[in-house]
Amino acid sequence: GLNRPSKRCLAGSAPCEFHKRSTCCSGHCIIWWCA
């Protein structure tokens, strides 16, 4: 997927609200999924 660190987040939290398909990875929101 696209690895784009964006806003910070907590691992295991709900998907980031700024993008429906973003995922929390390594403390940051990335689009799609963790590499």
From Swiss-Prot:
Superkingdom assignment: Eukaryota
Compartment(s): Secreted
GO molecular function: ion channel regulator activity; toxin activity
Residue stretch(es) of the prosequence: 1-35
Gene Ontology, cellular component aspect: extracellular region
Disulfide feature: C9-C25, C16-C29, C24-C34
Tissue expression summary: Expressed by the venom duct.
Main location: secreted
Keywords attached to this entry: Cleavage on pair of basic residues, Disulfide bond, Ion channel impairing toxin, Knottin, Neurotoxin, Secreted, Toxin
Protein function: Probable neurotoxin with unknown target. Possibly targets ion channels.
Family the UniProt entry places it in: Belongs to the conotoxin O1 superfamily.
Domain notes: The presence of a 'disulfide through disulfide knot' structurally defines this protein as a knottin. The cysteine framework is VI/VII (C-C-CC-C-C).
Protein name per its UniProtKB record: Conotoxin Cal6.1c
Originating species: Californiconus californicus
